[in-house]
Design a protein with these regions (language model features):
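Acidic, polar-rich low-complexity tracts and alpha-helical solenoid repeat scaffolds
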Residues: 1-395
Length: 395
């Protein structure tokens, strides 16, 4: 990009636009300081008023600052952009810029102003409206306006039932209901979430908190059933360990400790009682090798951990993810597929979408089209981003 600018001396318009194009190139490479530097040169040109890109340059500049987490500097530039676009509010970038203004205010903990801006976006009913409603709900919760939070998030589910954020909204509605001591309403909401979104990242927390809500209302049999479901469906997660602790407390409170002891004996290899020092030592040692990029040593150590401590170990989900990535980096694709497939079977884990994508792509490359199709379909079910959902749809 710099070479283009050096040679773009005549006419000056070319040089001006070259600065802008260079800024775009740096931005796509996530080189945000260089993006800002090129935009400053672009804006300093004497013929800037003639440029057709000067408005979009504001948008690019604001995003470069935003992506560096300089929210205080990004906000006024996003505001300049929305002012310049005030006659074209149907443009999707207008609503997007408003959302980023809301995010900047949210990061500054100005939750009321953030909520007001998100409300503006929601009223536009443009792209990003569902995100705006979710964020407005979060802001209302942080203002301790729990009834308003539940009302706002309910509108998200009603207006955008297929939104990527519908499960997040439902989870936060349940939490708002608990804050208002509406335990039975929260129980119903958690049940609906687990039924409708069993693979959601919110499912393990919802399952655990459902058990806790049952316990609070002294519905001990239902609490026991819910805690056991969490332990069995989300083995190896922090929620499973918390559920075991909750289960123990329920059995103690209902004077059924013998039943608890009998249940723990059925867990077999699921070493749920506590994370032993050996468990953590083996995992942390292997994890360090992964973080250092020593993938062969990491794969060996993580495989050892998975064999010795899983499915009930405290770090099984992360260990499976790191092992899969290690084999992928080593181009040992059969082993990578094995680990990614195992990861895809751990319900509610945050890596499920990526795991399905990797198995689908690797199977496709091996011309194992039936397997690839299966995982592309699974990925479409759990996809949390529009880009990945598009990948899943086109296979």
């Amino acid at each position: 990009a710099n070479l283009v600018i050096e040679n773009a001396t005549q006419p000056s318009t070319y040089k001006t636009e070259a600065y802008y194009l260079a800024a775009q190139a740096h931005y796509r490479l996530h080189q945000y300081p260089q993006t800002i530097a090129q935009l400053q040169l672009y804006l300093e040109q004497s013929n800037i008023a003639e440029s057709t890109n000067k408005t979009m340059a504001l948008y690019l500049h604001a995003y470069a600052l935003f992506n560096q987490k300089d929210f205080a500097a990004a906000e006024p530039i996003f505001r300049q952009y929305t002012a310049a676009m005030s006659n074209n509010t149907a443009n999707t970038t207008y609503a997007d810029a408003l959302n980023r203004i809301g995010d900047c205010l949210f990061q500054a903990r100005d939750f009321q102003q953030a909520s007001d801006v998100y409300h503006q976006v929601a009223a536009l009913k443009s792209n990003g409206a569902d995100y705006a409603i979710l964020q407005q709900g979060y802001a209302q919760g942080l203002l301790h306006h729990y009834a308003e939070k539940a009302e706002v998030l309910t509108s998200l589910i009603e207006q955008y039932p297929r939104s990527d954020y519908a499960d997040d909204a439902m989870y936060e509605i349940a939490r708002a209901q608990l804050q208002q001591d509406k335990n039975e309403d929260a129980i119903h909401t958690y049940q609906q979430l687990l039924k409708k979104y069993p693979n959601s990242n919110q499912a393990p927390k919802s399952s655990l908190e459902l058990g806790m809500a049952y316990r609070t209302t002294k519905q001990y049999d239902a609490a026991i059933e819910s805690f056991k479901s969490t332990i069995e469906h989300y083995a190896g997660t922090e929620e499973a360990y918390a559920a075991l602790e909750g289960l123990e407390q329920v059995y103690v409170e209902s004077n059924k400790i013998d039943e608890y002891i009998a249940y723990t004996k059925t867990l077999n290899r699921m070493k749920m009682q506590s994370a032993t020092s050996e468990d953590s030592l083996v995992y942390v040692t292997a994890e360090l090798q992964y973080m250092l990029g020593n993938y062969a040593q990491a794969a060996a150590g993580l495989t050892t951990y998975l064999t010795r401590f899983c499915p009930g170990g405290r770090h099984c989900t992360n260990a499976t993810y790191y092992a899969a990535n290690s084999y992928y980096q080593l181009k040992q694709y059969d082993q990578a597929i094995e680990q990614y497939s195992a990861l895809a079977d751990i319900q509610g884990n945050p890596y499920m979408e990526e795991a399905c994508m990797r198995v689908a792509e690797l199977s496709y490359d091996k011309q194992e089209y039936r397997t690839a199709l299966y995982y592309f379909q699974r990925m479409q079910e759990v996809a949390s981003s529009s880009n990945h959902r598009l990948t899943a749809m086109i296979g």
